[in-house]
Amino acid sequence: MKRRSFINQNSFGLAGALISPKIFEYSKIIDTSRITQNTIPFVLSTWNVPESTQIAADALEKGVSALDASVLGVAYEEKNLKNNSVGNGGAPDRDGNVTLDACVMNHNGNCGAVMAVENIMHVAALAQDVMEKTPHVILAGEGAKKFAIEQGFTPEDLLTESSKKAWKEWLKKGDYHPEINVENHDTIGMLCIDKQGNLSGACTTSGLAYKMHGRVGDSPIIGSGLYIDNNVGGAVATGLGEEVIKTVGSFLIVELMRQGRSPQEACEEAINRILKKHEGKPDFQVGYLATNKKGDIGAYSVVSGFSYTHNKNKINQNTNSNSVY
């Protein structure tokens, strides 16, 4: 009989203090006989999120799968009230509703996504449930919320007082234009490689602040906000989703790596594909982050200000990406 072990909730330390109990359902039974030490666990995330990458890295060290670790890692930012572009406290749409989007993709190419979900904080976890517990890939709106409640997620008001105050200030003018690198964070996209050498990822966001109600960007769209091919590598996107969708950016990057491009070369080409459709310096930001199966990293953005966090050998490092402008 193969040895199996449970990952104890308390073993995640800081995560245990800040993330709801529902999240710890990701610490599933681990088949320890399949765990090897040949691959050093690897975590890569958009923006400066050292707590999230450390939580994911700690989980990987304990044998958690790359998918479970990435969902657990981004859950920290979904709970983090200081991040107003993800989860609880996320900026609302123009009607004052916080609507969340997320997707996940594992090493087998299986994926799940949720769009325009209200009152459910941990939407990356919900996307994983869509992947694992339904015959579908995407659930949206009230249907996704209903499914979440059936799975044990607790509905809650995600509009914080600070987000509400900012929204009311915006209402006085009503001007709508995406802010570049607002507070130096945006969509949280995370890529993990586990001890078995498998690559998976998760992507979560509250979308553009003061968007039209029902707007969905790239984050929950497989191939745009996130794409994984376990034989090649993975990529995630951040920034103005409409521009990412038009070139199916994350899929493009992985396909370029399949053709022999390095992660850096692939990210640069994906940004250039966007810029070819615009004259001069654009007034929006898009950033891409990618890795191949060897752990080589690529990152590139339209304008400066995009950064990423890398955790390897238990060390976090935040790096500013190169950019066109």
Where are the regions that the model predicts?
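Binding-site signature for planar aromatic cofactors or substrates
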Residues: 23, 27-28
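Solvent-exposed, well-ordered amphipathic alpha-helical segments
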Residues: 4-5, 21, 75
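N-terminal secretory signal peptides and thylakoid transit peptides that target proteins
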Residues: 1-15
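Hydrophobic h-region of N-terminal signal peptides that target proteins for export
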Residues: 16-22
